[in-house]
Structures are given as structure tokens and as C-alpha cells.
Amino acid sequence: MTTSWSDRLQNAADLPANMDRHALKKYRREAYHRVFVNRSLAMEKIKCFGFDMDYTLAVYKSPEYESLGFDLTVERLVSIGYPQELLNFVYDPTFPTRGLVFDSTYGNLIKVDAYGNILVCAHGFNFMRGLETREQYPNKFIQRDDTDRFYILNTLFNLPETYLLACLVDFFTNCDRYSSCETGFKDGDLFMSFRSMFQDVRDAVDWVHYKGSLKEKTVENLPKYVVKDSKLPLLLSRMNEVGKVFLVTNSDYKYTHKIMTYLFDLPHGPKPDSSHRVWQSYFDLILVDARKPLFFGEGTVLRQVDTNTGKLKIGTYTGPLQHGIVYSGGSSDILCDLLGAKGKDILYIGDHIFGDILKSKKRQGWRTFLVIPELAQELHVWTDKSSLFEELQSLDIFLAELYKHLDSSSNERPDISSIQRRVKKVTHDMDMCYGMMGSLFRSGSRQTLFASQVMRYADLYAASFINLLYYPFSYLFRAAHVLMPHESTVEHAHVDIHESESPMATRNRCSLDFKDSEFKRHHLTRSISEIKPPNLFPQKPREITHCHDEDDDEEEEEEEEEEEEEEEE
């Protein structure tokens, strides 16, 4: 009887020491069903699944929802005195991307890498060339920590605002009625700085969201603005079977109730043959008015919502967790107490890299899942335009060939100008496949600030959290090795390093036996005491002590086993 690979791989004795990588190709799910891993996470250790609502459970349709927000913000600006001509602008989804930085001094939209190096710079609709950029940023670099000047437009809600800033700067720079200045524009004796304009836009956006008609118009036509996924009840019900599920949203109860009712307004329950269930039944805890990111710090008073009126009941809620109660405010500490969970027991799923992901990880140690809707298009370009990526690799090979037989004694200077021009052209074509500002994650070979934040703070990420449906709850999401250039560009072949070729070859940490006392005495110039230290040398670990992956650590399992043994005694 033959044994399948699946059976053999579950028996430590049958595991092969090594294998030809072509003999057993690693299984990967379809790209659009994948969950991508920055830090290893064992799903069986997760006891609570937490969700944000806006752009997570409720995905707003693009560009319809951004267009609505854009139009309402423009109307608000015109109502406070901005020119009527602005009403002619229409939201263009091909221009903005998330993660751009607005320079409130010069009015520029800037795409930067993790260190503040400028990748793309646009003044209005004008994409600035290198010389133009260097006139305002001599080193093509910005100080990102200067938050008074530089504002990061990181969220999906920022997309209409990003495009509106470009529209305004372009309008006031090119309209004949206004005189353009380096830091703003003039209308006769009136001067408006880009900083003041930016603050007006920020105030208008806040007004539209909190006092205006954005939510009202969204609710009036939910099919137009909100994506409904029939798989949502199924995933939440499966999560209910293995742990607790909670909702934490900054939205108020009335809006939350209308959105969630629409999402679960299906003719069936979790399965096609099951009866319909109200949305509240899928959650062990529902919390509105969270005021994230404040929620992950000191928080606010925990109140109870009267679900009949939507108003808050007086007094602070001090009771235990009760199914069906809707809470308002509170903090992540209070939530953990109600759920009986600690930091790493919780997987929190959200779209806001600062309000949801960064703060929940840094302040509470929650495991994090970032929803990135743009990832669907990024993957499409990555696969559909593979010929462009392959051409860039070929150009790298051509470049290496030109320098192949040259060293520091060579006077020959190969003409690489044609290859450089081609690299720039292919890179530009590749960037334009994503949109005018290029990819959300990179510009050419360099990763963006947004990409670095995703890698730093999100344990998992995907285009949609629904992709968790395609993984068992016992799954180990194991992070791939992050290779440095000396690892990714050097093949796994034995290389002999001779001391004559490289004096650095003597810096070998494993070949010499430093435990030889004679070797040590030979190098000592001071006298040796007859009284010896308890340990002359460190001992090589005989067991696995180095924590390579966050969820590879077996200490927690050992502690749980010890606790179970104590309880049995």
C-alpha cells in the first residue's frame, strides 16, 4: 500500500531531509483567494475575531462612493466662498492613490518611500521632472516627521480629498484671475496659502462626514454605494464555531444598523438551505462610536445603546458581556475584559493602517489583518503585464553583460545610455498600468511608504477578509523569508573564500574552536587567576531557543500543558 505525501508529511520520521524543489511544487491558492503573510500566525491560537465596519465588512463601491464624497466636499467649499467653477470638476479615479503626502507649504502631492525619498511629485495636474523637484527639495527628500507641513493621505476615505487637492492647486495656479506664488496664490490684495487651502479642505471633508449628507445619501441608495457579499454570513458563522466575533466601528449605531442590515439582507442564512438571521446574531460583542485610534489608548466611557431609539442610556456600563447588547465608546482594555481575551488571542481585521492596524498592534499586541481592496488590481497588473517585468529582468542581464569582463583596472566605459533609457521607458509603462500615480506599493524597484507600513504593521493582508474562507481555522500562515540582496542574488552553491582574496574571510564565527584554553591564554596579556569564573565560554544551544516566527514558539503550548496537568492533580 502506497503512502500519500500528505500522510508522510505529518510524520516527523518520514520527512525528507531535502528534496528537489521541482519534485514537490509548493501548493498555492488562486491569487485572488490568497491571504499574504508578513509575520507567521497560527489560526488555531486565535480566540477572537474582530472587525471594523467601513471599508472592511462594508466595502464601498469605487468610484461611485468616492465621486459622491468628492461632489459633496466641492459643494461645501463653494458654499463657504470658493469659486463656482470648482463645481465643474468630476472625480477621476485614475489619478489618486493612497499613501501620498501633501506638502502644505508648496501645495505638492508627493509619493515617497519609507525614508522620505521622493518617488513622484505633482503640483496640481503637473507631474514635476527631476530638476523642478530639486528646486523645492534639493535632495529629493522630505522630513516625514514634520507633521505640521506634511500630511499623509493614507485611508480610502482620503481618495476624494487627494484628487480635490490636486484640482484646487491646478485651478489656482493656472486660472488667469489669480497670481501664482510659491506658497499659495493671490487675488488682488488677498493672499491664500496652500496651508490655508488645505485646512479648508480638511474642514470641508470632516463637515461632509459628520454634519453633511454623505451618510444620508449613502443609505438612500445602498445598492449603488455598498458591495453585498453573500459569503459574509457563512464566514462569520464559521468563525462563531471556533471563537468569538466582535465589531468595533467609529460609526454611530443608526448608520451601523442600516449598513449591517443591508449586508445581511439575504434570502438565507449562512448556508443556502438555512433560514435568515439578523445581523446582530453573528456577533458576540458590538461596539459603536469607538473613536479609534483613541479606543486603543485611554478610550472613552463605555455606554449602552438603546437599540429602539439609537440613543445612549445614561450611566457607565459595568456589567458582564451580554449577547444582543450594543455598546458605545469604551476602550480596547475594556473590550478584552468583556471577552476574557488577551492581546495575541485577537485577530483584528480592518482597512485603516493607522487607526485599525498600527494602534491595535503597538498598544495592545493584537494580531492584525489589513484589508487592501486595491490589491485586486495590483495582482491583475502583476500577472497580466508580466512581459514588462520580464523585460526589466532582461535589461538587467544586458547591463551585467556589458560589465562582465571589467574590473578596477579597466579604462573602458561601456555605453549604457540606451539600456538606461529603455529601463526608464519600461518602468514608466509599468507604473501607468496602475494609474497616474503608479502602484500603491512601489515606484519602479523601490517600495513606497505605504508598502513599508503594510509590511511593518500588518501580520496578514489581502484584498478582502472573505479570503479567509479558503483556509482552515487550523492553518499556519507562515511568513516567507525576507531576503536581502546578498541572499536573493547569490545562488546556493559552495563558495571557497581565500584569505588572500579577502581579509574579511578571517571573520568566521564558527570555524575556530575558541574554547581551547591554550588559544585563549596565548592572547591574554594580563595574569590569569587561579579562581575561575563559573562559565568560561557560552554553550551552543542544544534545543531550539531562537524565535524565528512569532507563532512558531512552543512555550505557550508547554505552559498550557503544565496548567492542565496541575488542574488534573
From Swiss-Prot:
IMP binds at residues 52, 54, 202, 206, 215, 249-251, 292. Allosterically activated by various compounds including ATP, 2,3-BPG/2,3-Bisphosphoglyceric acid and Ap4A/P1,P4-bis(5'-adenosyl) tetraphosphate. Binding of an allosteric activator is a prerequisiste to magnesium and substrate binding. Inhibited by inorganic phosphate. GO terms for biological process: adenosine metabolic process; dGMP metabolic process; GMP metabolic process; IMP metabolic process. Gene3D superfamilies: HAD superfamily/HAD-like. Its EC number is 3.1.3.5, 3.1.3.99, 2.7.1.77. It catalyses: a ribonucleoside 5'-phosphate + H2O = a ribonucleoside + phosphate; a 2'-deoxyribonucleoside + a ribonucleoside 5'-phosphate = a ribonucleoside + a 2'-deoxyribonucleoside 5'-phosphate; IMP + H2O = inosine + phosphate; GMP + H2O = guanosine + phosphate. Its cofactor is Mg(2+). Binds 1 Mg(2+) ion per subunit. Belongs to the 5'(3')-deoxyribonucleotidase family. Homotetramer. This is Cytosolic purine 5'-nucleotidase. It comes from Xenopus laevis. The gene is nt5c2.
